[in-house]
């Protein structure tokens, strides 16, 4: 939550912290209270801002966020849908998520798609469309959404993470190594990074077999399809890309780009 607050404040406070207004400072304290789980105090601070400035974007957005965190999704929708800010993708993301959690997945998808029409390079919105496709077992569509999100917004780490996890359940786990390493280089020191490190280690363990003193068998790429719960989707890569992909993954985190086996 602190990260999203900094992003919001940057819209209003360009340059130095001294540019922040007392209202911004109260909103910042409200987010700190949310981080601490003190939702009542966060609500009080936000209400004090809105009493003086009912159209304050930050205060309204954070109020919607607070309601979402409290699992009051219908109320979050009512607050967020009143905010008029076409150029801020996180607003569409949060509103869409609130619709989805309130049980209106169709409206959630429309919200993400509307946000992308206004902000075509919003990788976070492709991420949410991919997540819905994944939840509905439309794995080919999920793959396309995550890849598009990584293409238009390469600095947003979550699409790389989702791609790595999707390929981890496929017969092309070589791409788990590539996307996973990219994710870990963008997002460092988080719980998600630790989990991805474990995923990569497991991918190596599951796909490298020592078959003798001088023989190693690698099975990172097999038949170009992803399988999950009996469903399959086509992957536009085959075994020919293994060497390039493996080198990219191995060099991304300082591991030597060539290996010599005795």
Show where each model-derived region lies:
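Alpha-helical segment of the N-proximal tetratricopeptide repeat
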Residues: 21-48, 52, 62-65, 69
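Helix-start (N-cap) detector for alpha-helical repeat units in TPR-like alpha-solenoids
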Residues: 22-23, 57-58, 88-91, 123-124, ...
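Canonical positions in the second alpha-helix
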Residues: 48-49, 82-83, 114-115, 148-149, ...
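Canonical tetratricopeptide repeat
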Residues: 62-65, 93-94, 128, 162, ...
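Alpha-helical linker/edge segments of TPR/alpha-solenoid repeat scaffolds
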Residues: 106, 173-177, 189, 201-226
């Amino acid at each position: 939550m602190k990260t999203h607050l900094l992003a919001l404040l940057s819209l209003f406070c360009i340059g130095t912290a001294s540019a922040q207004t007392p209202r911004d400072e109260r909103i910042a304290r409200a987010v700190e209270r949310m981080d601490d789980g003190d939702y009542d105090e966060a609500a009080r601070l936000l209400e004090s801002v809105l009493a003086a400035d009912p159209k304050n974007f930050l205060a309204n957005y954070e109020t919607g966020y607070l309601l979402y965190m409290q699992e009051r999704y219908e109320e979050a929708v009512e607050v967020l849908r009143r905010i008029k800010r076409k150029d801020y993708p996180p607003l569409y993301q949060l509103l869409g998520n609130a619709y989805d959690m309130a049980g209106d997945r169709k409206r959630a998808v429309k919200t993400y798609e509307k946000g992308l029409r206004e902000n075509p390079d919003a990788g976070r919105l492709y991420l949410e469309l991919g997540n819905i496709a994944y939840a509905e077992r439309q794995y080919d569509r999920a793959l396309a959404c995550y890849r598009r999100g990584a293409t238009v917004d390469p600095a947003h780490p979550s699409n790389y993470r989702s791609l790595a996890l999707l390929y981890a359940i496929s017969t092309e786990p070589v791409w788990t190594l590539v996307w996973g390493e990219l994710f870990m280089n963008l997002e460092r020191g988080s719980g998600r990074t630790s989990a991805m490190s474990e995923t990569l280690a497991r991918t190596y363990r599951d796909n490298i077999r020592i078959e003798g003193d001088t023989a190693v068998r690698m099975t990172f790429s097999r038949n170009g399809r992803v399988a999950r719960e009996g469903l399959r989707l086509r992957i536009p890569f085959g075994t020919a890309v293994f060497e390039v992909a493996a080198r990219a993954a191995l060099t991304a985190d300082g591991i030597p780009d060539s290996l010599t086996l005795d």
